[in-house]
UniProtKB/Swiss-Prot annotation:
Protein name per Swiss-Prot or TrEMBL: DNA-directed RNA polymerase subunit alpha
Gene3D superfamilies: 5' to 3' exonuclease, C-terminal subdomain, DNA-directed RNA polymerase, insert domain, RNA polymerase, RBP11-like subunit
Gene behind this protein: rpoA
Keyword presence, Lyase: no
SUPFAM superfamilies (UniProt xref): C-terminal domain of RNA polymerase alpha subunit, Insert subdomain of RNA polymerase alpha subunit, RBP11-like subunits of RNA polymerase
Alpha C-terminal domain (alpha-CTD): region residues: 269-341
Reaction(s) the record says it catalyses: RNA(n) + a ribonucleoside 5'-triphosphate = RNA(n+1) + diphosphate
Originating species: Lolium perenne (Perennial ryegrass)
């Protein structure tokens, strides 16, 4: 962080992108300013945004690879230049773009001799490769080579303990961090009591999203963190009132669906195959469910009202939105018999 004195004017608080460029397929750069801020505010915003950008943005990555009959990750495979460990490291570097939730399967199946690159990965429709030229392995002999892959969307850095995987399946330390780096600097302007600050924010991403998209998502995540306090103020309840308040259940999926075998929706599609991103929920409700690892309609129906009300930022109006959505996917007559508001 750098502080400098510059001349400037005090206008209504606003932000804008002052520089944007694409250095390569896997390196995007953006520079933004927010001004004017009172003394100390630039630090508050800069620190919060930097942490949110580096740790709260979701990314898609390869989380597991399965080789046939490979005793350990340091093994070598006849006809392949790289060891299994080197192949795993190359797979870890593959940059993917998607809106998927949960785990999806992918694969590589080629015949040598040839170079294997990211474009050889057979992906589900919802996933795309940012840079198809990323190397994976070099087949030096005419052999058939197949790998089964698992792809997931997550945030941060996920590690898994290595075990003796007899089936040739190996976890990859997944790096779901589309933002590579964030810097911010603060510039002071004005004199005396008219002194203000300008926040400069620099963002580098891996190409799976633009710096502007990353900044928007980080800002939304920060806003969601403070929504409970805003709602408490709007409702006008004191701490003691809120502590002792009982929330009547507006909906009870698990209890009221007891003894009801709802494994499929009205169209006969299994509920575990209907993902919440297909339900057209409001973004706030959708984000609440996503953060609680509720990815499918079956996940949603397995929750009680107590489970849902414990989700951060989840409110009564979210329950009403979910009810409206359920009417589209479940038998209405059965729902009316089991669920009431």
């Amino acid at each position: 962080m750098v502080r400098e004195e510059v001349a400037g004017s005090t206008q209504t608080l606003q932000w804008k992108c002052v520089e944007s460029r694409v250095d390569s397929k896997r390196l995007y750069y953006g520079r933004f300013i927010l001004s004017p801020l009172r003394k100390g505010q630039a630090d508050t915003v800069g620190i919060a945004l930097r942490r949110a950008l580096l740790g709260e943005i979701e990314g898609t990555c390869i989380a597991r690879a399965k080789f046939g009959s490979v005793p350990h990750e340091y093994s070598t495979i006849a006809g392949i230049e790289e060891s299994v460990q080197e192949i795993l490291l190359n797979l870890k570097e593959i940059v993917l773009r998607s809106n998927l939730y949960g785990v999806r399967d992918a694969s590589i199946c080629v015949k040598g001799p040839r170079y294997i690159t990211a474009q050889d990965i057979i992906l589900p429709p919802s996933v795309e490769i940012v840079d198809t030229s990323q190397p994976i392995a070099n087949l030096t002999e005419p052999i058939d080579f197949c790998i089964e892959l698992q792809i997931k969307r997550d945030r941060g850095y996920q590690t898994e303990l290595r075990k003796n995987y007899q089936d040739g399946s190996y976890p990859i330390d997944a790096v779901s961090m589309p933002v590579r780096n964030v810097n911010y600097s603060i510039f002071s302007c004005g004199n005396g009591n008219e002194k203000h600050e300008i926040l400069f924010l620099e963002i580098w991403t891996n190409g799976s999203l633009t710096p502007k998209e990353a900044l928007y998502e980080a800002s939304r995540n920060l806003i969601d963190l403070f929504l409970p306090f805003l709602h408490a103020e709007e409702e006008g309840t004191s701490f003691e009132e809120n502590k002792n308040r009982f929330t009547p259940p507006l909906f009870t999926f698990q209890k009221r669906l007891t003894n009801l075998n709802l494994k499929k929706n009205k169209k006969g599609i299994p509920l575990n195959c209907i993902f919440i991103d297909q339900l057209e929920l409001p973004s706030r409700t959708y984000n609440c469910l996503k953060r609680a690892n509720i990815h499918t309609l079956l996940d949603l129906l397995s929750k009680t009202e107590e489970d849902l009300m414990r989700i951060d930022s989840f409110h009564m109006e979210d329950g009403k939105q979910i009810w409206d959505t359920l009417e589209k996917y479940l038998p209405i007559d059965l729902l009316k018999n089991k669920l009431s508001f």
